[in-house]
Amino acid sequence: MKLIGPDFYNISDLLTEEELFIQKTAHDFVSNEFKPIINEHFEKGTFPLEIATKLGELGFMGSALPEESGGAGVSNVAYGLILHELERGDSGLRSFASVQGSLVMYPIHAYGSEEQKEKWLPGLGAGELIGCFGLTESNFGSNPGGMATTAKKDGDEWIINGSKMWITNGSLADVALVWAKDEDGIVRGFLLEKGMEGFSSNDIHGKLSLRASVTSELSMVNVRVPDSSRLPNIEGLKGPLSCLTQARYGLSLIHISEPTRPY
């Protein structure tokens, strides 16, 4: 089996048969099931959410995470090949899967409690639940040091106030991982559920790029969450930065995917 598309540097020789098979599986899914429907969604600025469970069935959500954490337990190389093929279909598709796996499933797997893992990871890995990552705000990019969103401790609860901007999957999400600074200026991660009082989202329309990706603003006004919603095993900037490191691996594949799109 060989790498699909141009292989000027004989990269196929560096890949395992499993990795090549996984790439072909992703390639066939994009070519046969995704490309026929993407044009309409691109024009309308919508995402075909009905494919989420198919992505889960194929193991494309959090692929490199262990199976007990909702992933497929494949190599990081295989995960990269999956994202490469999803990007070939559309940037919105790659972004959807990358956020779900690298920015939502990964931090729950790495920093969450056992209860949080049991509650969220199976559904997220299956594509039955959708997640988003709330870091960027309107006055700064993905720079956690400039964060204005706050988390104030009140007994066994936290009160979250602030907003997040340019959030992929925002209005689609059943759970949002929102990063906020506590009263000591320590960055902490909280799992906010759709429908919580004071928690809302508003989609951003008229984009020139990533049109098939749902991008939203998240608003938190005195949102009360129990302490059990806080990621217990991480605090400080390492939390969001480690998630971004996971996601940037997928972003690097864009530069390969675009020129190979015709293949």
Predicted regions and their residues:
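A structural signal for short hydrophobic beta-strand segments in well-ordered beta-sheet cores
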Residues: 149-152
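Intrinsic disorder at enzyme termini
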Residues: 1-18
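A short core secondary-structure module
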Residues: 161-201
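Hydrophobic, small-residue-rich alpha-helical packing segments that form membrane-like cores
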Residues: 142-143, 158
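Internal helix-loop-helix
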Residues: 57-128, 168-175
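A short, Trp-centered hydrophobic/proline-enriched beta-strand micro-motif
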Residues: 127-135
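Single conserved hydrophobic/aromatic residue that forms the stacking wall/gate
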Residues: 254-263
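A glycine-rich, basic-preceded beta-loop-alpha segment at the flavin cofactor/substrate interface
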Residues: 2, 76-78, 195-198, 214-248
